[in-house]
């Protein structure tokens, strides 16, 4: 594996251990040239997924993009990053287990909203404001009202 600091091609694994219920291997690496230390994660990828965007174009599924969007929603909410990592892994497993080579960004968004609703209402509202493209304060009011009544659009994630 290439060193992220000096770009040297050959690094050594100093420690390997399973994490996330055995679905990921965490490796601590060290560069023999610059001495830089870094962590890599190895996980099984069942299939390549394509995301169908609202615009009609396709792009490869990007786990890191999903993670960044959830991290933005939970920022400053005191939620354990390891827990968020497990949530993201669960969402990815759900997507892969659908058996479909392509999935709409809408379905991904619904899965994320369902997960966030069970974690933190504020994170749910933050994500919903982007996912649902809120335009004014009444949009926030509506989703808060839905939350208080227990109504969400995540109930039927995969009903077509």
Swiss-Prot record:
The protein's role, per its UniProt record = Negatively regulates transcription of bacterial ribonucleotide reductase nrd genes and operons by binding to NrdR-boxes.
Please give one Pfam family short name: Zn_ribbon_NrdR
The record's free-text note on cofactor binding: Binds 1 zinc ion.
Which cofactor does the UniProt annotation name? Zn(2+)
Organism of derivation: Bartonella henselae (strain ATCC 49882 / DSM 28221 / CCUG 30454 / Houston 1) (Rochalimaea henselae)
Q: What is this protein called?
A: Transcriptional repressor NrdR
Residue ranges covered by zinc fingers (unnamed): 3-34
Family statement drawn from the similarity comment of this UniProt entry: Belongs to the NrdR family.
GO BP of this protein: negative regulation of DNA-templated transcription
Report the NCBIfam families cross-referenced here: transcriptional regulator NrdR
Q: Which residue range or ranges hold the ATP-cone domain?
A: 49-139
- Which gene is annotated as encoding this protein in its UniProt record? nrdR
- The region annotated as signal peptide is none
Entry annotated with the keyword ATP-binding: yes
- Where, by residue number, does the polypeptide cross the bilayer? none
Q: Which UniProt keywords apply?
A: ATP-binding, DNA-binding, Metal-binding, Nucleotide-binding, Repressor, Transcription, Transcription regulation, Zinc, Zinc-finger
An example of a GO molecular function for this protein is:
zinc ion binding
């Amino acid at each position: 594996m290439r060193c992220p600091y000096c770009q040297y091609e050959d690094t050594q694994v100093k420690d390997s251990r399973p994490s996330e219920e055995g679905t990921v291997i965490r490796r601590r690496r060290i560069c023999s040239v610059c001495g830089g230390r870094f962590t890599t994660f190895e996980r099984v990828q069942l299939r390549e997924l394509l995301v169908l965007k609202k615009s009609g174009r396709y792009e490869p599924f990007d786990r890191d993009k999903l993670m960044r969007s959830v991290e933005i929603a939970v920022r400053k909410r005191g939620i354990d990053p390891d827990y968020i990592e497990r949530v993201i892994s669960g969402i990815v497993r759900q997507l892969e287990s659908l058996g479909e080579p392509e999935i709409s960004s809408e379905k991904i968004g619904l899965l994320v909203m369902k997960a966030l609703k069970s974690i933190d209402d504020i994170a749910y509202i933050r994500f919903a404001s982007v996912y649902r493209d809120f335009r004014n304060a009444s949009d926030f009011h509506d989703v808060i009202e839905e939350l208080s009544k227990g109504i969400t659009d995540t109930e039927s994630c995969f009903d077509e």
